[in-house]
A protein has these predicted regions:
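ABC-family P-loop ATPase nucleotide-binding domain
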Residues: 1-52, 260-275
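ABC family nucleotide-binding domain
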Residues: 41-254
Length: 275
């Protein structure tokens, strides 16, 4: 995936759940009765997505004819072997890269019609990101990292909301610490605070537990699902963790550049094919 600064700056399957009722009273900084979602509509749609890159042996097709819809409040897991194109797809869906063919509509906006600054503003205001390696900016404090998307979106109460969000993840006492002064689990909790502080309609998570031990990873995942449940945020999750994938409403498998709905068993589970 691209560096997180690009996310914020210009530089089996169950059907989609009913549109959630957001427990706004439980979320710091969220006004009563205000939902960040467009109820009953897709927050993300990908149509006919292909991604090709040049190589020494000619053109390489990374993604081929990908179709995908995500409804408001829905959680979708994308699984598959390493190198299958999962993270590439996530970057395209988030507008961090552009497809060779096809269209991505994010929160009602055709990403192909937006310039880089417009994409960055859209992400800063309505989209959250969580990465495997945390992607916190090392020169900023935990508080400043959490404030970043709010400041880029022009929000006037960034400090207050960021402090409330850090308290919600149990790190208000670490607000002045820089990332290297924090443990891996603490860094990922700061990343979650940054991802959710803008009350996102959609969260992209790329292997969020990949650099954490099992116990810490489980706590981070519980926190992520708790926060998204309170806000009603949709989730697109790339993971190798089968237990984590099972917590989602739908599971899709990426293999050979193609995306397919997955049956009730995942590879490596009883009845599944090992990866």
């Amino acid at each position: 995936m691209n560096d997180s600064s690009h996310a914020f700056s210009s530089d089996g399957r169950a059907g989609p759940p009913a549109s959630p009722v957001v427990d706004t009273a439980a979320v710091p900084g969220v006004e009563a009765g205000v939902s960040p979602l467009v109820e009953g509509e897709n927050v993300l749609r990908a149509h006919g997505i292909r991604k090709r890159v040049g190589g020494p042996d000619g053109e390489l097709v990374i993604l081929s004819h990908v179709e995908m819809d995500v409804s408001a409040g829905e959680a979708i897991a994308i699984v598959g072997p390493s190198g299958s194109g999962k993270s590439t797809l996530l970057g395209l869906l988030a507008g961090l890269d552009s497809p060779s063919e096809g269209t991505v509509t994010l929160l009602g906006k055709d990403l192909g019609s937006l310039d880089e600054d417009e994409r960055a503003r859209l992400r800063a205001g309505r989209v959250g990101f969580v990465f495997q390696n945390f992607q916190l900016l090392p020169g900023l404090s935990a508080l400043e990292n959490v404030m970043l998307p709010l400041e880029l979106a022009g929000e006037g109460d960034a400090d207050e909301r960021a402090r409330a969000m850090l308290a919600d993840v149990g790190l208000d006492h670490r607000a002045g610490h820089q990332p290297l002064q924090l443990s891996g689990g603490e860094q990922q909790r700061v990343a979650l605070a940054r991802a959710f502080v803008s009350r996102p309609a959609l969260l992209f998570a790329d292997e969020p537990t990949g650099n954490l031990d099992t116990d810490t990873g489980e706590k981070v995942v519980d926190l992520m699902f708790s926060l998204r449940g309170k806000l009603g945020s949709a989730l697109v999750l790339v993971t190798h963790d089968h237990a984590l994938a099972r917590r989602c409403d739908r599971r899709l498998r990426m293999d050979g550049g193609r995306l397919d709905a997955l049956a009730d068993t995942l590879p490596g589970e009883a009845g599944g094919t090992p990866e």
